[in-house]
Amino acid sequence: MFKTLYSRIAIYAITVILFSALMSFLFTNIYYHFHLKASNDAKIMRTLKEAREYERTQKPKPLDTYLKHLGQMNYQIMTVNEHGTKHFYGETFRKNTISQSAIKKVLNGEDYHGIKNKPYAFFVTGFFDNETDNTVGIQFKTDDGALAVFMRPDIGKTFSEFRIFLAVLITLLLIISISLVIASTYSIIKPVTALKNATTRIMKGDFSTPIKQTRHDEIGTLQSRFNTMRQNLGQVDQMRQHFVQNVSHEIKTPLTHLQRLLTQLELTQNEEEKQLCINEMFEITNQVSELTKELLLLSELDNASHLTFNDNVHLNTLIKDIIRHEQFRTDEKDLVLFTELEDLYFRGNERLLHQAFNNLIINAMKYAPQNSMINITLTSTNHLIIFNIENDGSIAEEDAKHIFDRFYKLSDESSSNGLGLAITQSIIHLHHGSITLTSDDKTQFIVKLFI
């Protein structure tokens, strides 16, 4: 029954309508029994006493004719004489339930308040209870002795048309309400069903089909955010495919080269050529090893929940150590390094920060022209540390857009695997910092870390 949200909402709403109708009936019944019964009893008793007074003063003859006339005025009347003989006027009572003791009391001159004293019944409205005990009664004096007269309004006749009207009204109310509930439930569920179908498409790898935003409420917001999520997942999937292709290419190329060198090594007899092959194989294995290390580091950065950032890093010392370690690169290209480093500390992950600054410094040395200068500065302003590294030469605008993409290379001939700057950016972002590139006559990388 509740396998779909549509049936669940529709059944809940219909249940609420029916339950509300039932509770309304019960509370109305309670209200009648505890607030209206007494006043209803008093009004009918007053009418009956006025009828008795009229009969006493005007002496309409005979009494039977007078009571028949009252019966024709939509009253139900029962009379009982001292011998127990009963006569009925107007519509017939459904049940004759009045007790003999009540009849005797009325014959003895006591008033009978059966309407007011009618016992409360949970699912029965006493107002419509067509029984002789649900009446008021008084004593009439006749030439033949005392006569007990019991009377109640003929509700069935008085409200017959109204009851039909009320029944039609309630029936139409329920039919229209339930129909509208079903229709409105469908309008609510329709976009949810569309979302469900869209998630099924995404599970099957279809990220290209959007869903139409049809509303401006919470469901409309959900539709909008779902489309955003779909686009992001599509981008992630494209990046994943691109990443797998690049990794496959980066691994396949050196392996193919190694296979060729092994074949060449097996066939050559020249010792010098053999040594060249071996040296080249060592170089290729080192490249593959570096690629593996950087891929593992990227995986670590993508799942950074286990990383800690509590090291008190002396940035001045860290940068100087990198420059000293890479001194051979400056000697090879006759580079001149100008450094201006403030004595600054930063709380973070020292291993990762060393990797980030190392990548930036090595890149600057690697792509700087022969006999050129590299400027490195480390300064601080209001709650901000700024690292700036600048070398001669420029990067094309199209290349600059993708410089931080994984596996992006400025040149196919480059020995780089295109992961260094992507790793650097990830590390800086994990430290809640930023890294930007500007390039015109010179190329400049700017790292900002918040203290």
Swiss-Prot record:
Its EC number is 2.7.13.3. Autophosphorylated. It is found in: Cell membrane. Keywords: ATP-binding, Cell membrane, Kinase, Membrane, Nucleotide-binding, Phosphoprotein, Transferase, Transmembrane, Transmembrane helix, Two-component regulatory system, Virulence. It is an enzyme of class 2 (transferase). It catalyses: ATP + protein L-histidine = ADP + protein N-phospho-L-histidine. The keyword Translocase does not apply. CDD domains: HAMP, HATPase, HisKA. The modification Phosphohistidine is found at H249. It is a multi-pass membrane protein. GO terms for cellular component: plasma membrane. GO terms for molecular function: ATP binding; phosphorelay sensor kinase activity. Residues 186-238 form the HAMP domain. Residues 246-451 form the Histidine kinase domain. Pfam families: HAMP, HATPase_c, HisKA. It comes from the Bacteria. Disulfide bonds: none annotated. The keyword Repeat does not apply. The chain crosses the membrane at residues 9-29, 164-184. PANTHER family: HISTIDINE KINASE, SENSOR HISTIDINE KINASE CPXA. Member of the two-component regulatory system HssS/HssR involved in intracellular heme homeostasis and tempering of staphylococcal virulence. HssS functions as a heme sensor histidine kinase which is autophosphorylated at a histidine residue and transfers its phosphate group to an aspartate residue of HssR. HssR/HssS activates the expression of HrtAB, an efflux pump, in response to extracellular heme, hemin, hemoglobin or blood. This is Heme sensor protein HssS. It comes from Staphylococcus epidermidis (strain ATCC 12228 / FDA PCI 1200). The lineage of its organism: Bacteria, Bacillati, Bacillota, Bacilli, Bacillales.
